[in-house]
């Protein structure tokens, strides 16, 4: 998880998770 997906995951999971993004430090990242 090094590239931010432009989405936060403080209250809800990453919607961009369908694109391979994961939550890290309250922000969604993708490798």
UniProtKB/Swiss-Prot annotation:
Post-translation changes: Contains 3 disulfide bonds.
Key words, A-Z: Disulfide bond, Knottin, Plant defense
Superkingdom, natural source: Eukaryota
Annotated S-S bridges: 5-21, 9-23, 14-28
BP term (GO), one: defense response
Function: Probably participates in a plant defense mechanism.
Name the record gives this protein: Cyclotide cter-J
Native organism: Clitoria ternatea
């Amino acid at each position: 998880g090094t590239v931010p997906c432009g989405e936060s995951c403080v209250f809800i999971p990453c919607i961009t998770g369908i694109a391979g993004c994961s939550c890290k430090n309250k922000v969604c990242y993708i490798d």
